[in-house]
């Protein structure tokens, strides 16, 4: 029987080396063997250092080099037979490859990626980024591409319009064959992706903090103006909770969007009209505007229509990329973007490096934004 075993294990090894990582259940079906038989093969191959095991997945072992610069045996430096890579190996340049899927490296996500890269490289690993440009299904395509190039784990920001998956959306994220951390995304209880680690800013707290500050200055009717982004729902939740908790008067309702998506120009015009009407007819004296770039564009147009900032309308922006460069320096809530990337990367590397972190409880981390006051 041994020749059959050898041939099967050789086939397993070839598939893992070609694909980078393979789910054990899928591999058993592909080879037409029972999961029990395949697990015995995997245990033997992992003990020889030919493959690594983790989270129901087997991955290839990257070949290293010995002190003389020669190719080391496949198992050399690979860590334990169960696929755990010692933390010391990471700090010494153990060669783990982290894949990161984000919509873009512009604006918000630029700092997230920079934070992740700094944390990954500080531990001797490498980061490879895949961009989705918010294209449908491109997040899954990029995740598959990174896995095919040998990524040992994924930092994942799916294209979920509301920041969390809609009905029937995103189930695939929970079936990925490697350790995965959601970055700046959330999944509701009961959704498969809720079982994943995740790291994000607490945008609801950031919005509430802005409302608290404005209320402390004496404002009783505060508006929220935000275009639709993955952050918007959490801003609305925090804003609404703070208005209720502080007993503030409700601002005029945001106008309904009507049928079909609006262009950026139409959205901007609607926001301008809303704020002008809220001040002149609705008794609003302060506003939280998302984002700071929108606020900087809105303020001169508000002033052109007779709404003075800050005399008639005090403004705090959500995000702090350019708020300090406005003609009227704007106070701003700054999400901890770089820290989110770094904490997500560290959490993923802790999972991959083994020890108690590998099988420990999943973590949902929310980092509090900072409020910067400018006079």
Residue ranges, per PLM feature:
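Periplasmic-binding protein-like
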Residues: 99, 151-159, 223-226, 280-291, ...
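Hydrophobic alpha-helical segments within soluble ligand-binding/sensing domains
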Residues: 187-189, 196-224, 234, 265-275, ...
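Short beta-strand elements in bilobed, periplasmic/extracellular small-molecule ligand-binding domains
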Residues: 121-131, 240-268
């Amino acid at each position: 029987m041994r020749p059959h075993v050898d041939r099967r294990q050789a086939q397993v090894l070839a598939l893992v080396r070609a694909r980078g990582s393979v789910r054990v259940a899928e591999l058993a079906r592909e080879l037409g063997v029972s999961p029990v038989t395949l697990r015995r093969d995997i245990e033997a191959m992992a003990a020889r250092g030919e493959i690594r095991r983790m989270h129901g997945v087997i991955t290839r072992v990257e070949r290293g080099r010995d002190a003389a610069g020669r190719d080391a045996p496949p198992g050399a430096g690979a860590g334990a037979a169960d696929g755990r890579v010692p933390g010391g190996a990471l700090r010494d340049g153990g060669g783990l490859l982290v894949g990161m899927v984000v919509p873009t490296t512009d604006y918000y996500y630029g700092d997230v990626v920079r934070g992740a890269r700094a944390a990954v490289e500080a531990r001797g690993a490498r980061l490879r980024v895949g961009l989705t440009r918010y294209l449908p299904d491109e997040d899954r395509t990029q995740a598959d591409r990174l896995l095919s190039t040998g990524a040992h784990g994924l930092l994942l920001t799916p294209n979920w319009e509301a920041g969390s998956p809609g009905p029937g959306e995103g189930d695939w994220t929970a079936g990925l064959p490697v350790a995965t951390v959601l970055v700046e995304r959330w999944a509701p209880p009961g959704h498969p992706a809720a079982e994943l680690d995740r790291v994000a800013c607490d945008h609801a707290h950031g919005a509430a903090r802005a409302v608290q500050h404005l209320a402390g200055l004496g404002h009783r009717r505060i508006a929220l103006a935000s275009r639709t982004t993955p952050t918007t729902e959490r801003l609305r939740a925090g804003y609404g909770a703070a208005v209720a908790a502080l007993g503030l008067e409700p601002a005029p309702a945001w106008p309904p969007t009507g049928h079909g998506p609006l262009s950026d120009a139409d959205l901007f015009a609607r926001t301008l009209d809303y704020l002008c009407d809220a001040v002149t007819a609705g008794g609003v004296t302060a506003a939280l505007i998302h984002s700071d770039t929108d606020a900087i564009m809105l303020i001169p147009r508000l002033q052109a229509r007779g709404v003075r900032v800050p005399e008639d309308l005090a403004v705090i922006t959500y995000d702090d990329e350019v708020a300090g460069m406005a003609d009227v320096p704007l106070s701003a809530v700054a999400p901890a973007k770089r820290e989110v990337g770094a904490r997500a990367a560290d959490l993923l590397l802790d999972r991959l490096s083994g020890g108690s972190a590998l099988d420990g409880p999943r973590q949902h981390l929310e980092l509090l934004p900072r409020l910067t006051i400018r006079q």
